């Protein structure tokens, strides 16, 4: 098992309902340690750049719009196999398909308002973490 870091974003649909603490408790209960966290208001330019990989997809515009509607909480989670563990803890993208006890089953409103984002690979985690955090902002 490898100690890894992954990026998590608590999305606007969850922050507007004051669910940050409850979602953090699920992450921590699963053995993921929050080593950096900040609440920010994304600009359209930032959200567009972050989700640039989806630019040609039909949902891109609504995704960017939803991510700038309210503040988000960006965080770095650390733990054994953190990327896979976080994806397991988040649950399926569609909350209707998510397993019981996962963040999306517990808190998501819909496939569009699914409460959290998590890196899907170790390489993407490194890129996504550096998008939001300087190394000096992350606890060892």
UniProtKB/Swiss-Prot annotation:
UniProt xrefs under Gene3D superfamilies: Nucleoside diphosphate kinase-like domain
Amino acids binding ATP: 11, 59, 87, 93, 104, 114
Q: Does the keyword Phosphoprotein apply?
A: yes
> A single GO BP annotation from the record?
GTP biosynthetic process
- Residues folding into a coiled coil are none
This entry's Enzyme Commission designation comes to 2.7.4.6
- Alphabetized UniProt keyword annotations: ATP-binding, Cytoplasm, Kinase, Magnesium, Metal-binding, Nucleotide metabolism, Nucleotide-binding, Phosphoprotein, Transferase
Q: Look up the record and name the cofactor or cofactors this protein needs.
A: Mg(2+)
Active site positions, chain numbering: 117
* UniProt catalytic activity: a 2'-deoxyribonucleoside 5'-diphosphate + ATP = a 2'-deoxyribonucleoside 5'-triphosphate + ADP; a ribonucleoside 5'-diphosphate + ATP = a ribonucleoside 5'-triphosphate + ADP
Q: Predominant location of this chain?
A: cytoplasm
Q: Name one GO molecular function term.
A: nucleoside diphosphate kinase activity
The protein's location, in the record's own words, is:
Cytoplasm
Highest taxon listed in the record's lineage = Bacteria
InterPro entries linked: NDK-like_dom (IPR034907), NDK-like_dom_sf (IPR036850), Nucleoside_diP_kinase (IPR001564), Nucleoside_diP_kinase_AS (IPR023005)
**GO CC: one term?**
cytoplasm
Write out the similarity annotation: Belongs to the NDK family.
The record's annotation in NCBIfam families points to: PRK00668.1 (NF001908)
Function per UniProt:
Major role in the synthesis of nucleoside triphosphates other than ATP. The ATP gamma phosphate is transferred to the NDP beta phosphate via a ping-pong mechanism, using a phosphorylated active-site intermediate.
Q: What quaternary arrangement does the UniProt entry report? A: Homotetramer.
List the HAMAP family hit by this protein, alphabetically.
Answer: NDP_kinase (MF_00451)
Q: This chain belongs to which protein, by name?
A: Nucleoside diphosphate kinase
């Amino acid at each position: 098992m490898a100690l890894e870091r992954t990026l998590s974003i608590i999305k606007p649909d969850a922050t507007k309902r004051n669910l940050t603490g409850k979602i953090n408790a699920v992450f921590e209960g699963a053995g993921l340690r929050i080593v950096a966290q900040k609440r920010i208001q994304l600009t359209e330019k930032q959200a567009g750049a972050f989700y640039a990989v989806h630019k040609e997809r039909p949902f891109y515009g609504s995704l960017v719009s939803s991510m700038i509607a309210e503040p988000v909480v960006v965080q770095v989670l650390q733990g054994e196999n953190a990327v896979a563990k976080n994806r397991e803890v988040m649950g399926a993208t569609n909350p209707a398909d998510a397993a019981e006890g996962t963040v999306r089953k517990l808190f998501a409103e819909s496939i569009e308002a699914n409460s959290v984002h998590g890196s899907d690979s170790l390489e993407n985690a490194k890129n996504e973490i550096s998008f939001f955090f300087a190394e000096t902002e992350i606890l060892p």
